[in-house]
């Protein structure tokens, strides 16, 4: 009941016909750990079937040489369409606390880590996240990511991680202390149940990602402006008056990141 991008393994030339059940655009890449002595691309993107048909003879040749591929549906859209559901689930199969939100943008460019995050989300993400966690039947901290596909209006599963990822503080600043939940559960203390703040928009902003994006990505100003000033409440990552050490330690890597972003923008690196 949870939609996800379909994937096909291409192990023989006849498998090249199995893409008919996939929806374009598609991404194809060699399977991990296959014959590295063969000269082969890392990733190919097919916008339409015509593009795939042009590349098909070369793919068949590479398969004959021993290379296997994985081809997957690619969900179009930028990095503003990625949603998060995170929870802590007990060994008795009960979700003790949970929060959901979205990545406002990603860094670097449209991939990788989050650039800023928010408590803005959809009830569909909450429902699908709970269903997936129950189906996995694991315990501990679980995070799932969904990408909104505006072609059919569905939130499609992108990945599941059995740990907290970088935007985890988004949950804490919107009222859900998931790591406290984990600690108290592990130490057999009473666990308090939290309700996430949804009445106001809260943005979690690490400038160590936002500034390089602003420098390196053309047209990023509109996202920067929204991420920094577009919420009812903004929380800076790292920077806190009560404990300035993390901020001070981060200044050097922050400056290095800025210099690298400038070089990228000037095409020097």
Language-model features, listed with the residues they occupy:
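Active-site nucleotide/adenylate-binding loops and adjacent lid/helix of ATP-dependent enzymes
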Residues: 1-70, 91
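Phosphate-binding site of ATP-dependent enzymes
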Residues: 13, 47-108, 120-130, 147-148, ...
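Flexible, glycine/charged-enriched surface loops at secondary-structure junctions
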Residues: 70, 139-143, 192-198
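Glycine-rich phosphate/pyrophosphate-binding beta-alpha loops
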Residues: 104-116, 161-175
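Conserved metal-phosphate-binding beta-hairpin within the catalytic cores
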Residues: 134-169
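Glycine-enriched catalytic-core subsegment of oxygenase/oxidase enzymes
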Residues: 173-180, 186
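Peripheral (often C-terminal) accessory segments that flank ATP-dependent C-N-forming ligase machineries
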Residues: 184-269
